[in-house]
């Protein structure tokens, strides 16, 4: 009998090629190496004090063995000391913090801990695409509520804060099956920071309907405007919010895969239980290195210099967009910006591959700019449902977590677009 293959789970069988695979494949096929402003990883090393901490940790005997399933005590203590002032309470490192294998495993652990089949999770569009698979693999049902772009965003630069959550749709999206809401602030891909007014409206609904919130705050150290945490708005909210953080985003070491969850003991104990079954423990030397890094960051004035350098990085792209008269979002936080290419005229009969030709216009923009201009970006309709994708089909997402030289070269190459307006 001929071998017919093993059928995959329905959880993955229906998956179409994701945007990361498509962009990476197209990038690899380029004759001239493109400048990559696509994925949100850094193309330079973490600061020396962070690297020194990692080198020191790898020589420690205990750091080469399993850590406590909830995370190394040194890192949980460092996180408590670093975040207690922001949460306006003393965070218990033993019961209110758990270290995870990157922020993504943190999300997965919360969904695994609290979702039953058919439970609904409200997700705001555009969304980080990993949310969706994490929800559905744990039996949840995503329900989408759009963040609406400002009308003037297609003709001039606008603040990311001008993109507004449709509160009426959020209210109407809540049903008896709703279990959770996912919030991302500072937002990927918009760079939006939700205002205190917006968060209070969300808080009213959370308390009224007894909902759990997963608050993705992995870019919290890159906030260029006042940053408010939902969990701190009212004392009772702490028991409704699990906050997700990232060592990789905070210190420029995304490959270390160390994240964390912060929340009330009643939430963390179940998330920690799921985390233990998913990966048992997180790599020890990188945890210890981050514990040291948190302790030394203020001494090196790291956070202020981090923000200052990213404002300068964004200014390189903003200047290039201004020269091209391309509208863009001015981020409130994070290291992403969205630029609007509605005026760019794609050549007729361009040979787009089938997997690109059948997708919205931003995929074609992304592919063409990659192949002809040599700059890699991300098409943001990947972060929307098919129904709402037209909202973003003229935009591209740029990640500016790159060296100044990389950004300057990207800006130079982008000037070639003048011939296509």
UniProtKB/Swiss-Prot annotation:
Q: Which GO terms describe its biological process?
A: amino acid metabolic process; biosynthetic process
Which key words tag this protein in UniProt?
Aminotransferase, Cytoplasm, Pyridoxal phosphate, Transferase
Q: Supply the SUPFAM superfamilies for this chain.
A: PLP-dependent transferases (SSF53383)
| Lineage: superkingdom | Eukaryota
N6-(pyridoxal phosphate)lysine PTM positions: 249
Record keyword Glycosyltransferase present: no
Cofactors, names only: pyridoxal 5'-phosphate
Enzyme type, top EC level: transferase
Q: From the Swiss-Prot or TrEMBL record, what is one GO molecular function term?
A: kynurenine-oxoglutarate transaminase activity
Instruction: Write out the annotated subcellular location.
Output: Cytoplasm
Name of one Pfam family that matches:
Aminotran_1_2
* This enzyme's EC code(s): 2.6.1.-
The record's Gene Ontology cellular component field reads:
cytoplasm; cytosol; mitochondrion; nucleus
The family assignment reads: Belongs to the class-I pyridoxal-phosphate-dependent aminotransferase family.
Q: What is this protein called?
A: Uncharacterized aminotransferase C6B12.04c
What is the species of this protein? Schizosaccharomyces pombe (strain 972 / ATCC 24843)
């Amino acid at each position: 009998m001929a071998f017919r293959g093993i059928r995959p789970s329905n959880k993955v069988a229906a998956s179409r090629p994701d945007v990361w695979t498509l962009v990476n494949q197209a990038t690899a096929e380029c004759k001239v190496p493109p400048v990559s402003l696509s994925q949100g990883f850094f193309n330079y090393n973490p600061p020396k004090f962070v690297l020194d901490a990692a080198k020191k940790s790898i020589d420690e005997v205990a750091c080469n063995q399993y850590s406590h399933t909830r995370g190394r005590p040194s890192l949980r203590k460092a996180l408590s000391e670093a975040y207690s002032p922001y949460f306006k309470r003393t965070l218990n490192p033993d019961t209110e913090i758990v270290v995870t294998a990157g922020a993504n495993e943190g999300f997965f652990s919360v969904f695994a801990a609290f979702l039953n089949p058919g439970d609904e999770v409200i997700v705001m569009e555009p969304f980080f695409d990993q949310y969706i698979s994490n929800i559905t693999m744990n039996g949840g049902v995503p329900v989408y509520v759009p963040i609406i772009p400002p009308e003037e965003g297609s003709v001039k630069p606008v603040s990311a804060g001008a993109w507004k959550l449709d509160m009426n749709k959020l209210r109407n999206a809540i049903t008896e099956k709703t279990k959770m809401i996912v919030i991302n602030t500072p937002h990927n891909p918009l760079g939006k920071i939700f205002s205190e007014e917006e968060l209070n409206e969300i808080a009213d609904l959370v308390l009224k309907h007894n909902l759990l919130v997963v608050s993705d705050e992995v870019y919290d150290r890159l906030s260029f405007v006042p940053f408010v945490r939902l969990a701190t708005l009212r004392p009772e909210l702490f028991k409704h919010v699990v906050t997700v953080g990232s060592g990789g985003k905070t210190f420029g070491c995304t490959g270390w895969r160390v994240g964390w969850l912060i929340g009330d003991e009643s939430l963390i104990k179940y998330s920690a239980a799921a985390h233990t079954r998913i990966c048992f423990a997180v790599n020890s030397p990188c945890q210890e290195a981050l514990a040291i890094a948190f302790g030394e960051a203020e001494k090196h004035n790291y956070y202020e210099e981090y923000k200052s350098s990213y404002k300068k990085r964004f200014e390189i792209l903003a200047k290039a967009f201004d020269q091209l008269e391309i509208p863009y979002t001015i981020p409130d936080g994070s290291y992403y910006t969205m630029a609007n290419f509605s005026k760019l005229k794609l050549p007729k009969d361009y040979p787009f591959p089938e997997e690109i030709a059948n997708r919205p216009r931003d995929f074609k923009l992304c592919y063409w700019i990659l192949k002809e201009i040599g700059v890699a970006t991300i098409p943001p309709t990947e972060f929307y449902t098919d129904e709402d994708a037209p909202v973003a089909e003229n935009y591209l997402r740029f990640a500016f977590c790159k060296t100044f030289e990389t950004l300057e070269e990207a800006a130079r190459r982008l000037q070639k677009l003048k011939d296509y307006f």
